[in-house]
Curated annotation (Swiss-Prot):
Primary site of residence: cytoplasm
Entry protein name: 3-hydroxyacyl-[acyl-carrier-protein] dehydratase FabZ
Source organism of this protein record: Sulfurimonas denitrificans (strain ATCC 33889 / DSM 1251) (Thiomicrospira denitrificans (strain ATCC 33889 / DSM 1251))
The EC number(s) this enzyme carries: 4.2.1.59
Gene it is expressed from: fabZ
Any Pfam family hit: FabA
Function of the protein: Involved in unsaturated fatty acids biosynthesis. Catalyzes the dehydration of short chain beta-hydroxyacyl-ACPs and long chain saturated and unsaturated beta-hydroxyacyl-ACPs.
Record InterPro entries: FabA_FabZ, FabZ, HotDog_dom_sf
Matching SUPFAM superfamilies: Thioesterase/thiol ester dehydrase-isomerase (SSF54637)
GO BP terms in the entry: fatty acid biosynthetic process; lipid A biosynthetic process
Protein family per UniProt: Belongs to the thioester dehydratase family. FabZ subfamily.
Length: 149
């Protein structure tokens, strides 16, 4: 399943400038998701991080992983309608073992690879990895819960 940014916005509430997922290229419900964000010098974050030496912030990479994980959790919840999805939100409970292995710069395509470690009811434990040109740049374990708004 491929999702463009319009489809993504039907599932998660994030909007510019905080929507950090441009496209989902693969979803295997209850298993994994692959998606990406194109990093451009026009991203607002580069106005201050860092002038003359732009580096995409690690916390933004983690947030992008979280958004991708939210899509995976929603899509794995069965045949949830757009209306049902609109009445729910994903809260992240913890981010553990976060590591940043290489800088991400303007011009990079940041690929998120998210996989389910465990799911029990509304609680999801996910393994998140971020790559640029198949080089691991960041990883973390994410725990999230889907709740009513």
């Amino acid at each position: 399943m491929i999702m463009d940014v319009i489809e993504i916005q039907k599932i998660i509430p994030h909007r510019y400038p905080f929507l950090l997922l441009d496209r989902v290229t693969q979803i295997k419900e209850n298993e994994s998701l692959i998606g990406y964000k194109n990093i451009t010098i026009g991203d607002n974050v580069f106005q201050g991080h860092f002038p003359g030496h732009p580096i995409y912030p690690g916390v933004m990479i983690l947030e992008g992983m979280a958004q991708a994980g939210g899509i995976l959790a929603f899509k794995s919840m069965g045949n949830m309608t757009e209306e049902e999805a609109a009445s729910k939100v994903v809260y992240f409970m913890s981010i553990d073992r976060a590591k940043f292995r290489a800088p991400v710069k303007p011009g990079d395509r940041l690929e998120y690879r998210i996989s389910v470690i465990k799911n029990k009811g509304q609680i999801w434990v996910l393994d998140g990895k971020a790559y640029v040109d198949d080089v691991l740049v960041s990883e973390a374990e994410l725990k999230a819960m889907i709740v009513d708004k």
